[in-house]
């Protein structure tokens, strides 16, 4: 494939280190310079710089956010300066590149269509996907992929994610993370994923989550969120996602949190309680107290003396049509043995 992430990353970090070492003994860099260095290292941009993604051979869609980490920081060419990446064919455009070709099996990337087609035909992940199966239903399979074992795969996945999550910054310390990737059962094409920090002092059960554009509006986000809480439940911890959430992430979480709270209060363990505390709700749902409070406010179901109005919950359920299908995850398909 045309680009090696490790080469691009090394080129970027070495240039940053060179600038820092070259300034040793001089005045400290200004806040503006520090900001520029941060943008170079994490690829943070205020506007889109790649117009569209060719994802596999037959999927094409626009990017949502810009990212500089695909490019040499000085030439703005794809990869490091010694490669022959092409600038955007659109002159005087905001875009550094018109089309980025991304393998839908392994997320390796190039700006050369011929090389891309050749890679896709022989990509090993087309025939053997990485990771270990942790959930397998007739519809969907979730695999755990360790960043320490599949470093390049996970780095390329994180790079791709930066084009669709505005708060996704880290992409190179993947050995500290596990990635839970969802596939259609029987397929080798990833549809989305969430990552989990292995050394989270806040005991977060999710670092970031993304369903890839071609597979959105299928309920896969709710499936992965529910799975992340199932992992926490098996670990015996009250947990939740890393904050801040992206705007789309917050929408997904509020829907899941609303469903789980409604179920426990209307049909579940707390249905016959005259009074419940925030701690009760936290224990039975696995949600953090702050997330419980946020969701109850979102449901607009808190009345005088902090009473919970069940009619408000039933109204929400009627509006969203979720009462007949409370959960997407089925325990009988879990394969969690470690």
Swiss-Prot record:
Active site, per annotation: 242
Effect of residue 106 to L: Loss of function
EC number: 2.3.1.48
Amino acid composition bias (Polar residues), ranges on this chain: 1-15
Variant or mutagenesis effect after changing residue 168 to A/Q/R: Abolishes catalytic activity
Keyword Phosphoprotein applies: no
Residue intervals of every C2HC MYST-type zinc finger in the record: 100-126
Binding site for acetyl-CoA: 209-211, 216-222, 246, 323
Compartment list: Cytoplasm; Nucleus
Post-translational modification comment from the UniProt entry: Autoacetylation at Lys-168 is required for proper function.
Sequence similarity: Belongs to the MYST (SAS/MOZ) family.
Primary role: Histone acetyltransferase (HAT) subunit of the SAS complex, a multiprotein complex that acetylates 'Lys-16' of histone H4 and 'Lys-14' of histone H3. The SAS complex is however unable to acetylate nucleosomal histones. The complex is involved in transcriptional silencing at telomeres and at HML locus. Also involved in rDNA silencing and G0 control.
The protein's name: Histone acetyltransferase SAS2
